Structure formats: structure tokens, C-alpha cells
From Swiss-Prot:
Induction: Expression is regulated by the cAMP-PKA and HOG1 signaling pathways via the transcriptional activator MSN2. Moreover, expression is also increased at low pH by the pH signaling transcription factor PACC. Disulfide bonds: none annotated. Residues 175-215 have a biased composition (Basic and acidic residues). This is Transcription factor GAL1. A zinc finger (CCHC-type) spans 240-255. Residues 113-122, 152-174 have a biased composition (Acidic residues). Residues 1-10 have a biased composition (Polar residues). Keywords: Metal-binding, Nucleus, Zinc, Zinc-finger. Transcription factor; part of the gene cluster that mediates the biosynthesis of liamocins, glycolipids (also called heavy oils) composed of a single mannitol or arabitol headgroup linked to either three, four or even six 3,5-dihydroxydecanoic ester tail-groups. Positively regulates the expression of PKS1 and EST1 that mediate the biosynthesis of liamocins. Gene3D superfamilies: Zinc finger, CCHC-type. GO terms for molecular function: nucleic acid binding; zinc ion binding. It comes from Aureobasidium melanogenum. SMART domains: ZnF_C2HC.
Length: 272
């Protein structure tokens, strides 16, 4: 540790000696005024930095000289192009914003030129929905007079007649479609009304049938009474110990009830 500390101190001392030996490059302040903070913080480049820069420049010069010598030995020549741009540099044109509504976009009319671009060529405006054939030709001619040609002018009467015929055909077709739709809707409403009436009649009949049905609460046949149904099924296979018949238990035997009545009338004892 002592050696390391001593070596670092020696290096610092050598660095300070080199800095003091080097000539100051910072300008002196006039009239003995105190220099500003930026001037005081600026330090002159160290000798190591200058030596490194000089070595790099010398290495680059040697490299260029070697390349030129090798090219000369190979018979190659060095060409230097000096091109001067005589055209003045103009600033890049910014984005041109044009406000247009849906009508102008659909019509396909050219967008008017702006005041800044009067000298430049203006291309046709953007088109949205385009029409083809004989559809809406009159509107397109109003917006674009160039679309009309001599042949189209000669055939204008024939095209107008055909357009009117097409419009009449379209009107008749639309009327037929509307009539068919109305007829189908009326038929569907009648079918739904008849179905509702049939459902109402059926529900009334079922309600009357439920009201007229006799319900025995002792023999309920619901979903929650599965144990009772199983018991009734088992009883149907059992034989009575009193009369010997199947289908009832001893406590439900009609002969036993009849015997009990006879014994009560006679005042005898009851068999249990």
C-alpha cells in the first residue's frame, strides 16, 4: 500500500511539474482584472494529448503516402472532381393544406391553386367516389368541361333520351320492389297474427283442462315425490296378509276395515 501511495504521489508531482513548465495558453486579463469563471476553468491541453494528436496525424500522412505510391506503381491515376452547384438552394416546400368538403371530393373537380404556388403546375384534385358509364354525366360535365368531346356533343340528344328511359326503368323497378316488400310484410304480419291467435286458443284450452281435472293430493305425482311413486310401485307387487290379494298393504285392506266396524258394533276387542 505504501508503494502504491508513493507512486501516485510521485505521478502527481511530475504532472504538476509538467503543467508549471508548460507555457500558459490562456489570455491574460487586461488591467489586472480578475478573469471570468469560464476562462479560469479552461485548461491548456496536456503534452500527452498533443503528442497523441501529432502521432495520429503523422500516421495518417504515412498511410496516404503509401496508398498514393502503391497506386502510382500499379499505373493508376488519381482523379479529383470539382463540381460547383450553380443552382440556388431553395428551402424545402412545406405541406400544402387545402380545405375541401365531401362534395368537392366526390365530384372529382380540381382543387384551386393557392396563392403561394401560382407559378407551379397544379395537378388534378383527388377524387373520391367515381362514376362510370352514363351515371351522373351531367354533374361531371358541369365540374369538368374537358370531359365533353365532339362525339359526345353529337350524341348528347341520344344519351339524354337513353338516360331518361333508364330513369323510368329504374323508377318502375323501384315501385315493383316496394310493392313486393309491402305485400311480403303484410303477409308476414297476417301469419304472425294467426299464430298468436292459435297460441291464445291453445293456452285457454289447456287452462280449462287443468281447472276441470280432479286432483288427489294424497297421490301427488310431481318431480319431488319420487319416493312416493317408488313406494306405490312396490306396493303393487305386495300381497295383503289379511285377504291375500295384491295391490295394497294390510293396514289399507278393505276386509280389515269391515271387520273393525263389525267388532265395534258388537263391542268386541280389536285385532292389532
Amino acid at each position: 500500500m505504501a508503494g502504491k501511495n508513493m507512486s501516485s504521489r510521485l505521478l502527481n508531482m511530475k504532472f504538476m511539474q509538467r503543467a508549471s513548465a508548460s507555457t500558459p495558453t490562456t489570455p491574460t486579463t487586461p488591467d489586472g482584472t480578475r478573469p471570468s469563471k469560464r476562462l479560469r476553468t479552461e485548461a491548456a491541453p496536456s503534452p500527452e494529448t498533443r503528442a497523441f494528436q501529432e502521432a495520429a496525424a503523422a500516421e495518417e500522412a504515412k498511410k496516404n503516402a503509401f496508398i498514393e505510391r502503391a497506386a502510382a506503381e500499379a499505373g493508376e491515376t488519381k482523379w479529383v472532381l470539382s463540381v460547383s452547384d450553380d443552382k440556388p438552394k431553395t428551402a424545402g416546400q412545406g405541406l400544402r393544406i387545402v380545405e375541401a368538403g365531401y362534395g368537392a371530393i366526390d365530384s372529382g373537380a380540381p382543387i384551386p391553386e393557392s396563392d403561394d404556388d401560382q407559378d407551379e403546375e397544379q395537378s388534378a384534385g383527388m377524387a373520391g367516389r367515381r362514376s362510370f358509364g352514363k351515371f351522373n354525366k351531367a354533374v361531371e360535365r358541369q365540374h369538368n368541361p374537358d370531359l365533353s368531346s365532339p362525339e359526345s356533343e353529337q350524341d348528347s340528344d341520344a344519351s339524354s333520351d337513353s338516360d331518361s328511359d333508364d330513369d323510368e326503368d329504374l323508377d318502375e323497378a323501384e315501385l315493383l320492389i316496394k310493392a313486393e316488400r309491402k305485400e311480403a310484410a303484410a303477409k308476414l304480419r297476417a301469419e304472425r297474427k294467426a299464430q298468436r291467435k292459435a297460441d291464445e286458443v291453445k293456452s285457454k284450452q289447456m287452462a280449462e283442462r287443468r281447472r276441470s281435472r280432479d286432483i288427489n293430493l294424497n297421490k301427488v305425482g310431481g318431480i319431488s315425490n319420487a319416493a312416493i311413486r317408488n313406494k306405490q310401485a312396490n306396493v303393487a307387487n305386495m300381497a295383503c296378509h289379511v285377504c291375500g290379494q295384491k295391490g295394497h298393504l294390510q293396514k289399507d285392506c278393505p276386509d280389515r276395515k269391515q271387520r273393525r266396524g263389525d267388532k265395534r258394533k258388537s263391542g268386541g276387542a280389536m285385532d292389532y
